[in-house]
From Swiss-Prot:
Protein's recorded name: 3'-5' exonuclease
Cellular compartment(s): Nucleus
Keyword entries, A-Z: Exonuclease, Hydrolase, Magnesium, Metal-binding, Nuclease, Nucleus, Phosphoprotein
EC number, UniProt record: 3.1.11.-
Amino-acid positions noted as binding Mg(2+) 2 in the UniProt annotation, renumbered to this chain: D163
GO CC list: nucleus
Entry annotated with the keyword Magnesium: yes
Length: 354
């Protein structure tokens, strides 16, 4: 026996302890604790079926908030509570009353005057001559012809429609004044393209500053300021002092208010529509030559300006005459009382008897 005991290798206790520690390291107490605390999938399923799982479930919305169960409306108590709440605070219901628009659509007959659709106005058709010049000497010769025509007129005041065009870019802003258009007679419009001009011809400057010439347009003062910035030989102040803004004049004669555009003024006074195409309005006015659409656009602007001036002039004369007759028949006090009504004088002047 001793023989066999001597030959067989026997492990010492010192060697056995590290092996036990190594086994313990493979399964640490933390790992074993987690495993023991976790429930198996089968146990979790059993708890869920038994109603023991109180862990809040994640829902869409704010994380970590438990889902709120809706009230069971089949319950008689819940129905009674809902009915009592509605009686105390009745829900807002859409009114069955017809609105102005639906009522006017439902009723037979014409709509109310304030809701009537605006009348479709016919577009302006200009059939007169268009004289278009691009070179300095041609512009000077044309301006001289117009100047001589003005001096031959017997009237003390010669109205002249005036307008300007220039290119515009959203990146660089407005360009230099490129076109001047004028009209002294509804049968002919003059268009002067300034692209090749470093300086305006002296005769053109003399024409627009002539004492008999009354320049007119819509927002015309800003045109003169721009022209003076682009061409220093033009002084803006004398032109501004003697010009006529058609929008302001319309407010005085027709007793209207607000600011006017040429398009709206054309609708109101001339009962015509303008084709204010953005493609033409924002086109390259400095490029020579202008095409037919540009020429017609520029000519119509001053042509209709001359038409509006003549119509406002006629209305002003009629208004002055009617006011004088009213004062003569009813007295100054009645005239002042009439003016305080705030209505358009010409439409009410014959309806009041004092």
């Amino acid at each position: 026996m001793e023989k066999y005991l001597i030959k067989m290798p026997i492990k010492s206790k010192a060697n056995a302890v590290p092996e036990e520690k190594a086994v313990v390291k493979k399964g640490t107490p933390k790992m074993t604790g987690k495993v023991t605390k976790k429930d198996t999938p089968k146990e979790l399923k059993d708890k869920e079926n038994a109603g023991e799982d109180n862990t809040p479930k994640q829902t869409k919305g704010r994380p970590g908030r438990p889902a709120v169960k809706r009230k069971n409306l089949d319950n008689p108590d819940a129905k009674a509570e809902k009915k009592a709440t509605e009686e105390e605070n009745p829900p807002k219901r859409r009114s069955s009353r017809l609105t102005r628009s639906t009522r006017s659509m439902a009723e037979d007959g014409s709509p109310s005057p304030e809701k009537e659709k605006p009348e479709k106005l016919p577009f302006i058709k200009y059939k007169g001559a268009i004289k278009y010049y691009t070179e300095n000497q041609d512009i000077a010769a044309s301006a001289d012809d117009v100047l001589q025509w003005v001096e031959k007129q017997k009237d003390e005041v010669v109205p002249m429609a005036f307008d300007m065009e220039w290119p515009f870019s959203f990146q660089t802003g407005p360009g230099k004044s490129a076109v001047i258009q004028i009209c002294v007679d509804e049968k002919c419009c003059y268009i002067y393209q300034l692209t090749n001009l470093k300086k305006l011809p002296a005769v053109l400057v003399a024409l627009i500053n002539h004492p008999k010439v009354r320049l007119h347009g819509v927002n015309i003062k800003n045109d003169f300021r721009k022209l003076a910035r682009d061409f220093p030989e033009v002084s803006a102040e004398p032109l501004i002092e003697k010009c006529v803004d058609l929008g302001l004049w319309c407010n005085e004669v027709c007793e209207t208010g607000g600011r006017w555009s040429l398009e709206r003024l054309t609708n109101f006074i001339a009962k015509k529509a303008m084709d204010k195409s953005k493609k033409v309005r924002m086109s390259k006015w400095h490029v020579i030559p202008l095409d037919e659409n540009q020429l017609m656009y520029a000519a119509i602007d001053v042509y209709i300006g001359q038409v509006i001036y003549r119509e406002l002039e006629r209305r002003e004369k009629a208004k002055i005459k009617n006011e004088a007759e009213f004062k003569e028949n009813n007295g100054e006090a009645a005239f002042k009382a009439m003016k305080t009504l705030g209505e358009t004088f010409l439409t009410k002047i014959n309806e009041v008897t004092l």
